[in-house]
Amino acid sequence: MKKIVGKRVMGMALAAVLLLSPLSCFGVGTAYAATQYEMKTEKTVTRGVTYEKNSRMTDAGVQNIHVMKVDLRESTLEIKEVESKGDYGLKETVKKLLTDNGAVAGVNSDFFGLSGSYSAAFGPIVRDGEVISAGMTLNKTEGQYAAFFMDEDGNPFFDYFTMTAKFGNEKKMLELAGMNKFASLVFPAYLDRNAMSNTSSLDKRFEKLVKFVVENDEITYISAEGENVTVPANGYVIVMSADYRKNAAHMFTVGDAVVLDVTSSVDLDEMETSFGGGGKLLVDGKITTANSIVASGRQPRTAFGVSKDGNTAIFMVVDGRGDSIGATHWELGLLMQEYGAYEAMHLDGGGSSTMVAKTAEDGAMTVQNEVSEGSERKVINAVGIFQNAKQGKIKEIRIQPSATRALMGRGVTFTVYGLDEYYNRIEIPANQVKMQAIGVSGKWEGYTFTPSTAGTYTVTATYNKMGAYHIGAVSSKTARLKPTNDSIKLKVGETANIAMTLYDTDGFMHWASTTTKYSVGNPAIGTMNSNVFTAKKEGSTNIKCEKDGAVAYITVTVGDVEAAKKPVVAEVKDVLDQKVTKKNDGAYYFNVAGKIAYTGTEEIDEKVYNDARSKVKSYVDANANVAIYGGLNDIQSKKKLDSLSWTGQYRFLSRGGVSLAMVAATNGGINATDATQWAKFTADIEKANNNTIVLVTDQTPSDWKSAAEANYLRAVLNKYVEQGKKVFVVSCYNKSYWSSVKDGVRYINLPNLWQADGTVNENYTMLRFRVKDGNVSYEAVNIK
């Protein structure tokens, strides 16, 4: 039923909104997150709908922004509010709400009461031209909770919606608290079939309800307390508590002629779509002042807006309270402007902020953002994007691997699927697709390829004269094994599943729980079946784990006994760690050393100080095209030698196919020291486009104050690894030498020459590099 049954008196309520320019809002000196670098990924959801993740490094930290754009001119697309399919007013996760209702994407929508399993959206809801619900309590004295509307002609607009509804007979008029909204029933509420067909659900939630059944402007039935009644198809029900009936509505009887008078700022009967939100964000392209309900500071945020021409809808979620800093009201306004919004409003934010989409690549409804509470909050409703076009013929094919990095002898399964003109995904059986691997040898079995040689390879898929390809890499060797738990404690009869991770020579991780060979040192204590250990008797032993020559041990203790001693496993040497001797072979050679100067408070004998520094200088300046001093250096190099010394500020050098950037992290990270370095080093590296990248810093990323910033650096560097570049991060810090390889990036720490007490550090180590034709080797040289 489209219209609310009863008489409607219309009146427009216009809310005043203060529009702000940057200067009038903040004044001079007020900062917002300035972007230094950004990484974007874009996916297609369906024709006319795109999803983009924009991960930005700002001077305030990482800011992850999720945006969906919808072309409202696409005739097969719809935007509409959705609620629980299970029970009216039941809170569900955004993913479930959208999936159950058949949407392809969407976000959380309106504000609601957090307590309990049931609630009601604050704002008005119109779906497919049907008035679903509306509240009477919002925006009475000021515009606080905005709502979006699209009329039957497709015209979008925003309004601080207000409504009042009165129900009465000739004796008394009652003010209604809501229409199909039942967060509480202190005051009477209107109910029709757009919410439910009978009152059984309400009777379970609220005790002793009394219902007036109304048809043709007449009360046809008044229920007993708690009695379930049927909602008439062409009428409505007024629901109230027994106390309210007794104290304020006792003058109503069966047969009374009644009237329903409704006044609202927008005629809902003329609307095709409506859903509620928070304060307005943009009006006429300008950012508004934040009203009293908009949370202050940087928070997780959800926003919705439309472009000036009304052709594009913009959904946005900004992650917060985790690795991402969130956004202020002002920053959210700037972001919505950047993505093309002219009119916009807040939707519910904080723990509710959720974006879900089924992209062509994902193939299933997936939460795209990082929800701030670690798991999805149950909310009252969501705004869904719907594709109404039926599945058509395949227009293109795509290919996806189960892993971007493969190992020799281990299968990689590819998925080949088709897309129609609306990007509906169509699965294709393997026997209809021709698969081929170029660059490495191996064996195909359906969609699974098991490589037998290493290297870069291309997989092509051909179906009905359409093709797709994937470029990947096969690692040649297992470098090390790492069990999730290197010790296990059990009782007799208990079992333990062993989770095993394999790292290849470039530090890429592969799961190897079931493909690793396990052998128990003392089989009397326990046995292995695949990757499951079963404890047989009390005692302690070691499980030997073997894969492709790599070995690890897990200590198992059964009962209250002393743990067995674990065998020592030799460290695996990096394949690029080789002897480097300068020759006239066309290669480029450079040396890197850590901090030489002493900056402590102890007194050092002048001769000892000079001799130690001179010895280091003789090593670093010799047999190289360039000498790099990654820590404070208080002695000059020979003028004829190309060199770069640490100054505590950003520096960059491009030589011999190598990009070398010095980035200061003195204060616990790049951002805390000088955030502009992000823009500088990424721009310089991309402009130089060298195949070898060396980042020198004065504090190892794992020790930065912000783990989010360290993770962002790794993501940036991994992007260069994916381009086939060799990447090194050399920290000049503390008193020990160490190296590790992770996801293709080599992390090396060079210790300081001097201990804090003024003695020479015997662990002092420098690096010698050789670079030629994209091939890199390095040697760690201890200088004693």
Question: Positions of the model-derived regions?
Answer:
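Binuclear metal-dependent hydrolase catalytic cores centered on His/Asp/Glu-rich metal-binding motifs
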Residues: 656-693, 703-715
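Active-site-proximal segments of metal-dependent phosphoesterases and phosphodiesterases across multiple
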Residues: 316-329, 691-732, 736-737
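Gly/Ser/Thr/Pro-rich low-complexity, intrinsically disordered segments
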Residues: 6-11, 29-570
